[in-house]
Regions:
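N-terminal targeting/regulatory segments, especially signal peptides of secretory
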Residues: 1-269
Length: 273
């Protein structure tokens, strides 16, 4: 995580807010909205197309030919976790049942031309689809559970967006740091989270990025520390690329958008390419 990554999320939050309107709907993406160019045929006429536009923008912004990580994609692959957490939160605003992420992947990402954009530097990944699939274990977490990581992620990202090379005084981030640690603590004390190896990896990514933020500050002595006793195995000092298990099942290419209204339960087949 860095300032540029979080500014990209801020760009999305400003034009496509992460909460519903007063009428309980997603915000519109109009012609003047930069995300409109990421909509298929320049038309985001459904809620899921709006979410897909934001998702594709973030993937392209980070890993595209002129993206944030164009020269070091491998060492920053964990940014994909944050994009998927954003996706989970946006889907969870209306559908809180099961694992809708799996169906979203099948319909909007897998075998879609725009996700075939090539990338370099990540072993086993030739395009965006491969990169996302490398984190496929996250899509097997129920959407309700995965979206719980969104609040601490956003607090941390807001800290990074304030901080920069021209502003290493982190006193303005203290309240956000307290907010992050409080939300992180809630997750680390949730047995359903800590008993899940995939969730533990996300906790590690968050805690490492928080600790890395503190190291960059001129004075972070007043920042609260993170207690990690419940995380197993122990988090590595640096976030690293995690290998995804390759589980082979058939994916139907005939899914329609309507399929997404039905949550995927734990009894459904695992995600595969």
């Amino acid at each position: 995580m860095n300032k540029e990554v979080c500014e990209s999320f801020l760009n999305v939050w400003e034009v496509f807010p992460d909460k519903l309107t007063k009428n309980n709907g997603y915000h519109e993406i109009n012609d003047g909205n930069f995300l409109n160019s990421y909509c298929g045929s320049y038309s985001c006429d459904t809620d899921l197309k709006k979410i897909d536009a934001g998702f594709f923008y973030l993937v392209n912004k980070f890993f595209g030919a002129s993206g944030v990580f164009k020269n070091n994609a491998k060492s920053n692959i964990n940014a994909v976790e944050y994009i998927i957490i954003w996706l989970s939160h946006m889907l969870n605003l209306k559908d809180k049942q099961g694992n809708i992420l799996t169906n979203f992947y099948k319909v909007y990402i897998n075998n879609q031309d725009k996700y075939k954009n090539t990338i370099n530097g990540v072993e086993g990944c030739s395009n965006y689809d491969d990169l996302i699939y490398k984190k496929n274990e996250l899509m097997k977490i129920t959407n309700e559970k995965l979206s719980k990581f969104y609040a601490p992620f956003k607090s941390l990202c807001e800290m990074y967006s304030i901080f920069g090379d021209d502003n290493k005084n982190c006193t303005k981030c203290l309240e956000k740091a307290k907010e992050f640690v409080e939300k992180y603590k809630e997750l680390s004390e949730d047995y359903s989270i800590t008993n899940d190896s995939s969730c533990n990896k996300i906790l590690c990514t968050l805690s490492n990025d928080y600790d890395n933020f503190k190291k960059k500050c001129k004075d972070s002595s007043s920042f609260p520390t993170i207690d990690k006793p419940n995380i197993t195995p122990k988090c590595p000092e640096q976030t690293s690329e995690q290998n995804s298990k390759q589980i082979h099942v058939n994916i139907s290419t005939k899914n329609s958008e309507q399929n997404l209204s039905y949550a995927v339960t734990s009894e459904d087949a695992p995600l595969s390419k």
